[in-house]
Amino acid sequence: MVIINSGNPFEMKYIKEEKKMDYAKESLRLHGDWKGKIEVVTRVPVENKDDLSLAYTPGVAQPCLEIQKDINKSYELTRRWNMCLVVTDGSAVLGLGDIGPEAGMPVMEGKAVLFKEFGGVNAVPICLDTQDTEEIIKSVVNIAPAFGGINLEDISAPRCFEIETRLKELLNIPVFHDDQHGTAIVVLAGIINALKVTGKKKEDCRVVVNGAGSAGVAITKLLLTYGFPHITMCDINGIISKNSLNLNWMQQQMTEVTNLEERTGTLADALKGADIFVGVSAPNIVSKEMVASMNKDAILFAMANPVPEIMPDLAKEAGAKVVGTGRSDFPNQVNNVVAFPGIFKGALEGRATQITEEMKLAAANAIAGLVPEEELNENNILPEAFDPRVADTVSKAIKDLI
C-alpha cells in the first residue's frame, strides 16, 4: 500500500494495486452531479380530484382530528412511525472539527442515506445555526413531535453529554448520540469476540482508552457496564486521574470510576501490562515498543481516521493478536453502520421511549453473535457492513427489551 499525503488528512490516498481512486476528488464530482443525496418521494397517487381530496383537504381533516384526540395516533396516521431526525450544530464533523451547519450537511445527508439503505429507516437531516446548548435543546424539543426518534450527530464534547441527557429527560421518544453510543456498541461487540480469540477474560483484563471525548467516554462507560473492572483513560496529557488538570465536568466524573489505582504518567506508561487498547484519538501515537510492553496477545482497536494510532502490521509485528481500525481496507473494521440502523429500526418498530443501557449491551452481543464461532479468528471479529442480517438481528435484540 502506498500512502500519499497532500497535507490535508482527508485528502490522503490509500492506493492498492487493484484499486486506484482519489475518493476526495471523485466524491466532490459526484456530489456536484447528485445535488443532494436524499429527496422526498410521495407514497400516494394524486392523479385526480378524488386523490387530491383524500391526500389533502377536505379529507385530511379527519386524521388530524383523530390525532388531536390521541397523539399516539400520529404513529398510525403519519410517517412518524418510521422517521427519525438527524441533527447537528456542525461543531465536530468527522475529523474536520467545527466547520459549521452548512458544511456539515453532506455528512448529515450521508447519514440519512445509511439509515435508509441499511435499516429501512427514513431520516431527515437538520443543521442548526447555533452552538448554544439551551437553543439546541429547545430547537429539538420543538420539532420532536414530527419524529419517532432523535439521532444527535457531530456535536462537540462536553456539550453533547448535557444535550443528550436533557433531551432524554424532556422527550418520550428515543434520543441517541451515535458518535458516543454507536461507536461504543461496535467496539464492545468487537472486544467480546476478541476475548474469545485470545482466551482472555474481562475480569482479568486491563483496558486503556485513549481519547476522552464523546466516543472515549461512551466506550469506557459501556465497557464498565459490561463488566471490565480495570479501565484507565488517557488524553493528550497522558493518564487521567483525580489529580489531572484541565478536565471538563464529564472527564472529572469519569475519574470516579476509572484508574482506581490512581496511576499517573504517559500513554506509554498506561500501556505497560495492558491487555486491551482502544484509541479514539490521533494518528501514529502508539509505537511498536508500546505494544510490545502490553500483555501477551494484546487486543488493539486503533480507530483514529484516516490514519490509526498504529498501523495494523506494525502492531502485529510487536505482538498484538487482534487489531481493529476504523478503515475498510484493513480487517476488523469498527463501523457504526452495523449498529445505529438496526437500533433505530428496533426502537421505532417497538415504539420505544428510550434506548437503555441494556439495549446497548444487547445490540453489542447481537452484533458479536453474527460471526459464527467456526469463522471467528484474529482477522474476523465483526460482521461486514453489507451483511444483510445485521439490521434485523440488532433490531430484534432491541425489540426484545421493549
Predicted regions and their residues:
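N-terminal ligand-binding/catalytic initiation module
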Residues: 14-173, 395, 401
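N-terminal amphipathic/basic-hydrophobic helices that include classical n-h-c signal peptides
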Residues: 1-20
